[in-house]
Regions:
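Long, contiguous binding/interaction regions
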Residues: 2-76
Length: 76
């Protein structure tokens, strides 16, 4: 029998609101809000690490693209 553990994704895709013109537009604020929302929806640490790694693997546009794959991103 395998002891393989699977990553736990959130129960549903959370929704977060980001004001790109304000301090919310800071990349680290976006990552923090996203991780908090994912965690609150039931994601485990491995899933959060996967998101962070992908989100930080490129430029700001990549961050927004990856983040929108994990959460419903409402941009102001």
């Amino acid at each position: 029998m395998s002891n393989r553990r699977f990553m736990k994704a959130p129960n549903e895709k959370p929704e977060i609101e980001i004001d790109l013109d304000g301090e919310d537009g800071n990349a680290f604020v976006i990552i923090g809000k996203t991780c908090k929302s994912l965690f609150n929806e039931g994601a485990d640490e491995e899933y959060l690490n996967k998101y962070r790694d992908e989100a930080m693997s490129g430029d700001y546009e990549n961050l927004l693209k990856i983040t929108s794959q994990y959460v419903n991103l409402n941009l102001k």
